[in-house]
């Protein structure tokens, strides 16, 4: 059955995927901005092509599904204004801007963002930035597993397909939130003797600072805990799994299966074949081979020549690459040069905040 894609991209952003870059004959660009907005935080980066410097801006969650449209847009404006101010420019001086924001799949949400941002700025879903960081905006697949999860692929003919990204109530399988929630459920199952014993019980008690694991139910429902607060427990899931707990380890196998199912749909619908990158992005992959190895194995069965790797460049870097495409200056940014600039800016920010 023929299905309509859940997401579409402007033709300018698909130029590398379809081999239509053409010549870059416009005057050189000076300032480009990329924004990566997720359920936990928002990061904006303005690249000064003349000075070869990146200026960063920060905000809270910009996912309207998590915090509401108004608060999400406030975070977005805060981050972009901060980055633009640090670059010492006005909004109008940006040659291109791409905002990859979680939850912006619907026209209504995108319209709300555009009401407070210049119309020339391109607004796409956050997984688009991850795909660009993973593939340099060329055919391939980007996989997010952070607080939430999402998969996007672009085929050699520019066909786009997304799977996942339905939020923590309806989806987010294989994400940090999902891993944390399954860990809490496993701890409760241990407590009531309906599941195997697991060190996740002690880990949950210590992490959430509750007197007993059953007290978690009260904490979750009466406080209530936010999506991000629950997702933060995934770091303990990884620690317990690395220590050899079989229940925690099994959760990573299940998470890999969930993501592989979505990746399979994306590969099939985009008709990707041969050699192409599958880039893994997000905090959940910090668990390392515990998570990456079973996922890579599952992907190898789907596409034996796919190159699976954890992406080293942050998604906001992918958004800057897309901003160059949106500005019609596809050759103005070298991905190999952008990553060290971004790494240096992030290290500088971390030092300032400590």
Predicted regions and their residues:
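ATP-binding/phosphotransfer module of carbohydrate and carboxylate kinases, centering on a glycine-rich
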Residues: 2-93, 133-139, 184-354
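Broad gene-expression machinery/nucleic-acid interaction feature
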Residues: 41, 96, 148
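Proline-centered loop/turn at the N-terminus of a beta-strand
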Residues: 96, 120-122, 277
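Glycine-rich beta-strand-to-loop/alpha-helix junction loops that act as flexible
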Residues: 98-104, 145-147, 276-287
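Phosphate-binding/catalytic loop of phosphoryl-transfer enzymes
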Residues: 100-200, 346-354
């Amino acid at each position: 059955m023929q299905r309509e894609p859940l997401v579409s991209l402007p033709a300018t952003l698909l130029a590398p995927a379809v081999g239509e870059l053409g010549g870059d004959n416009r005057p050189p660009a000076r300032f480009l901005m990329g924004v990566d907005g997720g359920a936990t935080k928002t990061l904006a980066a303005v690249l000064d092509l003349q000075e070869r410097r990146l200026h960063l801006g920060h905000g809270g969650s910009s996912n309207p599904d998590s915090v509401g449209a108004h608060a999400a847009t406030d975070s977005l404006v805060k981050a972009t204004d901060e980055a633009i101010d640090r670059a010492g420019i006005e909004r109008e001086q940006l040659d291109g801007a791409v905002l990859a924001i979680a939850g912006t799949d619907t026209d209504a949400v995108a319209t709300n963002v555009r009401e407070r941002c210049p119309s020339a700025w391109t607004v796409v879903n956050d997984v688009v930035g991850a795909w660009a960081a993973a593939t340099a905006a060329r055919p391939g697949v980007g996989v997010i597993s952070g607080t939430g999860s999402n998969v996007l692929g672009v085929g050699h003919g520019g066909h786009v397909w997304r799977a996942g990204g339905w939020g923590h109530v309806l989806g987010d399988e294989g994400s940090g939130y999902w891993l944390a929630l399954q860990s809490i459920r496993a701890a409760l199952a241990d407590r009531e003797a309906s599941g195997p014993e697991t060190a996740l019980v002690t880990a949950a008690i210590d992490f959430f600072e509750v007197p007993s694991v059953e007290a978690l139910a009260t904490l979750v429902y009466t406080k209530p805990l936010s999506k991000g607060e629950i997702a933060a427990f995934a770091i303990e899931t990884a620690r317990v799994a690395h220590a050899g707990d079989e229940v925690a380890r099994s959760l990573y196998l299940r998470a890999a299966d969930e993501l592989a199912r979505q990746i399979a749909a994306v590969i099939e619908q985009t008709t990707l074949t041969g050699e192409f990158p599958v880039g893994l992005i997000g905090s959940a992959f910090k668990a390392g081979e515990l998570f990456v190895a079973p996922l890579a194995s599952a992907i190898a069965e789907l596409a034996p020549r796919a190159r699976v790797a954890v992406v080293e460049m942050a998604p906001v870097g992918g958004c800057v690459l897309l901003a160059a495409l949106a500005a019609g200056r596809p050759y103005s940014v070298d991905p190999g040069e952008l990553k060290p600039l971004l790494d240096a800016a992030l290290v500088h920010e971390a030092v300032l905040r400590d």
